[in-house]
Every structure is written in C-alpha cells, then in structure tokens.
C-alpha cells in the first residue's frame, strides 16, 4: 500500500488519538501530544462527516477539560490548527484555547 506523506500523517494522528481516547476513558490524564492528537482527530472526522468550520471550532473547545489533562498542558496549547478535508475541499480549522 502506497501512502502519501499527508496520508501517513493522518494515520499517525488517528493512532495517537485512539490511544488518547482509550486513556481518557480509563481516567488517565492526557499529555501534550495526546491532547493535540485527540482534538485534531475529532476535527478531521467532523470535517469528513460534513460539519462546518464554525461547528468544528466550537466543538473543539468542548472536547477536553483541565481535569482531563496533565498539569501545565492547558497553558501549553493556545491553539490547534488542522487542515481538514471537507466534502467541498480542504480548509484550515483553528481552535483557540481548546482546553477550558
């Protein structure tokens, strides 16, 4: 199977997000890379489902709370930018202060 670098990146993000999702479900606090992957994958999947950029920007702020992540992680993540594939093309989704 031949994959482009972009496709490989998407698979890596999805794998990290799956791990983060399982850890979150067990009550394990997420670290920085897991938090980024969790938010990014949710945005990417929402785009594929046909949600709008505005919907995803709002949803991105509701995914993680301070109690879901390790100490200091919310202060490290000021924004998450995702180039997501929507039914009508690729768009940049920016989520400001995603962990409340």
Swiss-Prot record:
Gene3D superfamilies: Urease, gamma-like subunit. Keywords: Cytoplasm, Hydrolase. CDD domains: Urease_gamma. GO terms for cellular component: cytoplasm. Pfam families: Urease_gamma. The keyword Lyase does not apply. It comes from the Bacteria. This is Urease subunit gamma. It comes from Alcanivorax borkumensis (strain ATCC 700651 / DSM 11573 / NCIMB 13689 / SK2).
